[in-house]
Regions:
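N-terminal Rossmann-like FAD-binding beta1-loop-alpha1 element of flavoenzymes
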Residues: 37-67
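Short hydrophobic core segments
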Residues: 43-45, 152, 164, 174-190
Length: 202
């Protein structure tokens, strides 16, 4: 094999890698202010894909004074292993998820690591059970600060921050304070299954 062909092959491989990574990182990022005291900067309600993505972005921006809570047990957050009836996601498989542009974190990278690149190419739509497995891996590999079995029962103004009442599965309640609260309770979170009174009044 001559040097020209070797260089051409290496360049083609590099260009393929560049295309792959650009495809994986096509996602915006946002800045957030740093933590300044013991009050949580952000309380995230819901540890499904949206809640995990918000937590990851905050941690990337060095906002570590956050907490994510979900009333479901670990692995049962979101609809994927509970009430989702469709066998696959409805989004195109190449659409970015909670990875925030990190090339090794998209579903595609995880899928290819588990099943191979050929399997990814043959895949039409992502099966919901595999998506749930991916989200479990995403949460674990990033060590996101999620507390399961914790429900938010009340949000109240506390003079410059929000007082959130948290109830554990054993019924024990406590109040935490946060500057911001993100309701990441799913697509229907503001649709009607459960709606906090302050949101219903909007």
């Amino acid at each position: 094999m001559d040097a020209t062909r070797t260089a051409t092959d290496a360049l083609a491989a590099l260009e393929a890698r560049v295309r792959f990574e650009l495809d994986c990182v096509d996602h915006p990022s946002a800045a957030w202010r740093p933590a300044v005291d013991a009050v949580l900067d952000v309380l995230i309600v819901g540890a499904g894909q949206s809640g995990l993505a918000v937590a990851f972005q905050l941690l990337r921006d060095k906002v570590t004074n956050i907490r994510v809570v979900d009333r479901a047990p670990a692995g049962r957050e979101g609809p994927w292993r509970s009430f989702a009836r469709m066998p696959t996601l409805r989004s195109p498989k190449a659409m970015n998820g909670p990875d925030l542009g990190v090339p090794s974190l998209p579903y595609r990278a995880w899928h290819e690591a588990r099943f191979g690149a050929a399997d990814w190419q043959c895949l039409d739509m992502i099966p919901k059970d595999l998506w749930a497995d991916y989200l479990d891996w995403f949460r674990r590999v990033l060590a996101l600060p999620v507390a399961n079995g914790v429900e938010v029962t009340r949000l109240a103004d506390a003079g410059g921050c929000v007082a959130a009442t948290l109830r554990a599965t054993d019924g024990a309640e406590r109040v935490v304070h946060a500057r911001r609260v993100v309701l990441a309770t799913g697509l229907d979170g503001l649709g009607r299954w459960t709606m906090p009174a302050p949101v219903a009044a909007l």
